Amino acid sequence: MRAILLLFDSLNRHCLEPYGCGWTQTPNFSRLAQHSVMFDRCYAGSLPCMPARRELHTGRYNFLHRSWGPIEPFDDSMPELLKKSGVYTHLISDHQHYWEDGGATYHTRYNSWECVRGQEGDPWKAHVGAVELPPHLGQANKQDEVNRAYIRGLGKQPLEKVFGLAHEFLNENRDADNWLLHIEPFDPHEPFFAPEEYQNRYSGDYTGMRFDWPPYDHVTEPLAAQVHCRNQYGALLTMCDAYLGKLLDYMDVHRMWQDTMLIVATDHGFLLGEHGWWAKNRPLFYEELSHTPLFIWDPRTGVAGERRKALVQTIDLAPTLLSYFGVPIPPDMQGHDLQTVLQQDIPVRDAALFGMFGAHVCVTDGRWYICAQIDRAQRSMIIRCCRCISELCMHRKNCRN
C-alpha cells in the first residue's frame, strides 16, 4: 500500500474550476476531480496554519484547548504511528513554520523530511546591508525582499523545488511498498509571488504599486489594486495547478493509480476582498475561509468522478490514512475513516466544529452555520447564523456553490 498526501496552503475552494469557478485557470484540478471523489461539504477545523497541522496529525480538534504550537510529546501523531508500524513516511515542504520556534517538531515525526527554504519571510539568505522596499500596498518585509532575489528564474521557486523533490522520491521509491509521501507546498499562501509566465495569463492594465501581499484587515485599497491582487492569487493558483498536473502525469505514466492513494487537501481558505476583508483570522470565518476543497482517490474502492455530500473535516484525514495502511486508529481520535463515504455517500457526522483558539467558534451542518464571534471592545460574544453559500464571490457571475 502506498499513499500521497498533497496539502496546499490557503487553497480557495471557490477559486477552483471543478467547484464552479470560471475566472481562474485550473484545468488539472478538473482533471483530478475525474480521477477521484470530490467532496462538496468539507470544512476546516482549527485555524490557521499550525493548529490545522496538529489536527492533520492527531485527528482531534486543536482550537478548543490550545492555540498555535508544536506537536506535544503525548500526541498520537499519524505519521509517527505509521512509522512505528513499518510504513515509511516522508515529508517535503517549503512551509517555513515547520522549523520555527512554536511550530516545530511536526517534521520529526516522519522517517525523513526535506525542507525547502525561501518562502514568505523565512530567514534564509543573509544580507547585512540596508534593504530598500519598493513602493507597495499591503504587506512587505525586508527578509522576504532578500529571498525574492534568489527565487526568480526557472526552477528556483520553492514550489518548483518541492515538486522536484517529490518526483525524486517517486523515482527512487515508486516500486517499493508501504510508504506515505506528504507533499506540502506553502503556495498559494501569500505573498502571491508567481513567475511572469503565470501572471501574464491574468494580465491587465494595472500600473499602480506592487500589491501581492494583502493585509489582515478591511479592504481599503482602490478597486484596480483589489482586482490586481486577486489576479496575483489567480496566477499563483494556476502555477500550483500546473505542478499538480505534473504529479498526475507521473501517476499516469507509471500506473500508480492501481495501488496508490492520493489525497489533495488544504488547511483553510483566504479572503480576497469578499465581505470587505482580506486574509483570515480577524473576520468572521465565512464560507470562503472554512469551506475547503477535498479530493480523494482510494484504489481499494476504485470510485472516481463522483461527488459526496457527506460532511467531512481535516480531522478525518489521519484515521483515513491509518485505516488505509491497516494501522489501528487510537480511541482519542475524533475524526472518521472516510472509506465508507468513498464507497457510497454515507453521513459520518451531523455537525462540524471549526474555529480559532480565543476567537471564533463555529458549528455547521453543511447547510447553515452558527458562529460565536468575540467582540473584544464590548467583552461580549456575538452570535451569527448564516447560510452556507459563498454569496459574495468577487466574480459571482462565473462562480457557483
Regions found by a protein language model. Give the residues of each.
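A long, amphipathic alpha-helix that forms part
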Residues: 157-174, 213-262, 324
